[in-house]
Amino acid sequence: MTIQLIVTHAGGAHKDDFLACSLLAYMHGVPIQRRDPTEEDLANPAVCVVDVGGVHDPQLKNFDHHQFSRDAPPLCALSLVLQDLGLYEDALSFCSWLRPAEWLDTLGPNETAKLMEISRAALGALNSPLDMTLLSRFGSQRELHADSPVYQVMCMVGEDIVNYLRTLRERLNYLKANVQYWTIETDGEPIRALFLQQSEAIAKDPSFGIHAFIETEGMEDEIHAMVYPDRRGDGYGLSRYNDCQRLDFSQIESNEHVRFAHKRGFVAKVSTKDRVRLKELLQLAVVRDAG
């Protein structure tokens, strides 16, 4: 059945209902009404009822979690919509923001801060004007249509989440077949780098999926650097993986092959495509022990 309407609660908006409605708005392009659902809404599979109504029934497109018991898994409305789209497991694996969003909505800020191993004050400091403005503008509306700027932004957010998750698996398979691992000798432990060759197949976003790939391969503790095509120029980007302090690319900023090296040392852009030269640049970027 074709979806005709999205209904979510009135009043203050939270990240989970905003993102859940963003996904549904992108997928279906239908109006969003902020009000209590009727019994007819809950019984109508053409109406998505989000974060309100006291019912979770994917067949009827009811996506509320507030009726779940205190010891239930920390699923929010966003989780339930992602499950319905078949994207939840990949989102958990590759969207590091999802689990904290679930915790925040179901457990509250104090417990979320504990689980994230940060202070309550630090959690609050992570709020940005983007969060506050979008949630405030969304919460102030009674109905949103395709001509609403807020609705249009929501569709962009939903589109980016869906496209990221649906294309990531394809990119991971590509990386599995095409990456190389380099070992760069140093005075101490060698540096391990992941190298991805230039190709038209990845020209639009060459570095997409590399971090996720390293994690899925279980190589987080082995890789120190990444070498990948530079989408802004005809060369390569060199960057630290997980901000590995064994590399400082500002050390190579004066090299003739280097177009740009960040003063903080975490990334450089180079013109050479020669693999021998690329390995030499990595070696030159290795931080030597003082003395």
Where are these regions (language model features)?
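C-terminal accessory domains and tails appended to enzymatic cores
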Residues: 11, 15-22, 37, 43-46, ...
